[in-house]
Regions:
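Transmembrane beta-barrel domains of Gram-negative outer membranes and organellar outer membranes
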Residues: 76-283, 293-381
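N-terminal secretory signal peptides that target proteins for export/translocation
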Residues: 1-52
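Bacterial N-terminal signal peptides
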Residues: 58-66
Length: 381
């Protein structure tokens, strides 16, 4: 069903073009996979992965083309807000990567409180030059408490307090069945110990980090401020403080400073698109690895308003790698997280987010699977 409104024709043409592009990409990629699959991997596995990548690429192109469709500015509506998530790789999440937040600041006296629970399951192993080794086998559970308040003249400020637990978790069997059901590769998860915790990093034959017992506590606290530049455009700055214990990967041991811009526009009366770009200055971390001075992140978020109280969402977050000169898979490439789910309005003040996460495009750079449930309450003055 097409969204109603005067811009339905334009959106229909863009959507039709997207599906044609997606089909051509799949045909082209599958032809390539027939050669690659015969020499390296089973052709069915390679073609399946390339189909997914063709779809994701097409969605990104669709979001870009949407900029040229006649649109109107979005009114502030919390059901259109992005998912609050970043790359949950335990060696990356310790840094202060800004999250994709709303492009609208709260009005004077308006406040919003959130409580979220997320689980991310990791299973990655890699060896390089026989002296570099990394094992990321475990789960990260995070209880996030956040609060922000509007101060007038387009200003708002807030705080984020994470409570983190690193453990063996409980999702391994479920994820193995999930991958079997959809014919997805296990990556060795089904051959390893179930619900075990093993975080280990060796560089040059020297152990730099090891965690095999459960660790929990307060993570790095984030303070942020936002300024509305215009309708649908918001500038935010934030600082991450070293309040988490780096020995348990609850924090980085350093102070990071980030700057981000969030942008939102209506595609139609039911479709909304938003984007985010950010840069973060990293301080020296506890692992003692050679780090990049700056990390960049991009976010793209697409919303479909099914009903006045329900919206479905698709979001893709990318980040540049934070470590230099480390050829191990989880560190060597940019990270990507594809999130899909929705938001339901419970009352005039309350709403609930539920979404799932997969690692795309580089499977080893982000958790294999995750989900988040977040409750939010917005109080008017």
């Amino acid at each position: 069903m097409l969204p109603p409104g005067s811009d339905s024709k334009g959106f229909y043409l863009v959507t039709k073009w997207f599906y044609r592009l997606k089909h051509r990409l799949e045909v082209s990629f599958i032809e390539r996979s027939s050669t690659l699959g015969s020499t390296v991997f089973p052709s069915s596995l390679v073609s399946g992965k390339l189909k997914v990548r063709a779809t994701v690429f097409g969605l990104c192109v669709l979001a870009s083309v949407a900029l040229f469709v006649p649109v109107k500015r979005s009114h502030a509506d919390e059901l259109n807000e992005p998912f609050s998530i970043t790359n949950q790789n335990p060696f990356v999440r310790i840094f202060g990567l800004p999250r994709h937040r709303s492009s609208e600041v709260l009005s004077v006296g308006e406040s919003e409180s959130k409580i979220g629970y997320s689980v991310s399951s990791n299973y990655e192993f890699d060896v390089s030059n026989s002296e570099n080794f990394i094992a990321i086998d475990g789960e990260t559970e995070t209880l996030t408490l956040s609060y922000r308040r509007g101060f007038g003249n387009g200003w708002e400020a807030g705080i984020v307090l994470p409570l983190i637990k690193q453990s063996g978790g409980y999702l391994d069997r479920t994820i193995i069945k999930w991958h079997d059901w959809f014919g997805m590769p296990q990556g060795g998860r089904d051959q390893g110990p179930i619900d075990a915790l093993n975080y280990r990093l060796d560089i040059g034959g020297i152990n730099r980090f090891s965690l095999a017992e459960r660790a929990s506590g307060v993570g790095d606290v984030v303070l942020f401020a936002g300024k509305s530049l215009s309708s649908g455009v918001n500038l935010r700055s934030e600082i991450k403080l070293p309040s988490g214990n780096e020995a348990g990967l609850l924090g980085s041991g350093g102070t990071d400073v980030g700057l981000s811009i969030d942008y939102t526009r209506d595609i139609s009366s039911r479709w909304v698109w938003s984007a985010m770009v950010s840069f973060t200055h990293l301080s020296s971390g506890a692992l003692g690895l050679d780090q990049e001075r700056f990390v960049a992140a991009l976010g793209s978020h697409l919303v479909y308003r099914v009903k006045p109280k329900l919206s479905l969402k698709l979001q893709w977050d990318l980040n540049s790698r934070p470590y230099k000169s480390v050829s191990l898979g989880p560190f060597a490439k940019p990270g990507g997280v594809l999130s899909f789910g929705g938001t339901v309005r419970l009352t005039d003040q309350d709403r609930l987010d539920l979404f799932f996460m997969e690692n795309l495009p580089h499977n080893e750079t982000a958790p294999d699977f995750g989900f988040k449930l977040e409750f939010a309450r917005r109080i008017q003055k």
